[in-house]
């Protein structure tokens, strides 16, 4: 999806009056992530989590190719709409976890979000899998929010 198509998603209408948005972003795409936060009616607050990537089969750091330097970390931005309440003050920002499938984020992130915000209604957009307690929407899962008002383009499979 293009940035314009992403900005047009009705996230502002889906989100509760007092809600939090957690958005993964790579460093080269930070300007687009911040644009998307504003388009969806949220205000950027902080970097909620920093994922330091380990190799899957060795106790060493994973390094991608990067644009300027060999990249490792990804950030999960935190933005809010209204005045959501933090439920815990002991949630650490760092997530040290091995890489898994391409673009799959660490599962522990969901647990940290629930601990931080409480057991509230929540949805994962562009989900790669279903998770207990989470509604999902994306081209790799059966959506649990069919009234989202748009469809996620299906992955094109090539031989």
Locate predicted features.
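Class I S-adenosyl-L-methionine-dependent methyltransferase catalytic core
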Residues: 1-159
């Amino acid at each position: 999806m293009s940035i314009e198509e992403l900005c047009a998603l009705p996230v502002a209408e889906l989100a509760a009056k007092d809600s939090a948005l957690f958005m993964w972003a790579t460093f080269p795409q930070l300007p687009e992530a911040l644009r998307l936060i504003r388009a969806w009616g949220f205000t950027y607050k902080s970097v909620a989590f920093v994922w330091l990537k380990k190799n899957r089969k060795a106790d060493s750091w994973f390094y991608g190719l990067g644009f300027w330097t060999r990249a490792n970390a990804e950030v999960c931005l935190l933005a809010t709409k209204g005045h959501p309440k933090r439920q815990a003050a002991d949630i650490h920002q760092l997530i040290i976890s091995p890489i898994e499938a391409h673009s799959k984020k660490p599962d522990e992130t969901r647990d940290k979000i629930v601990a931080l915000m409480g057991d509230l209604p929540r949805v994962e957009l562009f989900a790669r899998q279903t998770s207990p307690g989470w509604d999902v929407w994306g081209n790799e899962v059966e959506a649990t929010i069919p009234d989202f008002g748009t469809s996620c383009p299906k992955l094109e499979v090539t031989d």
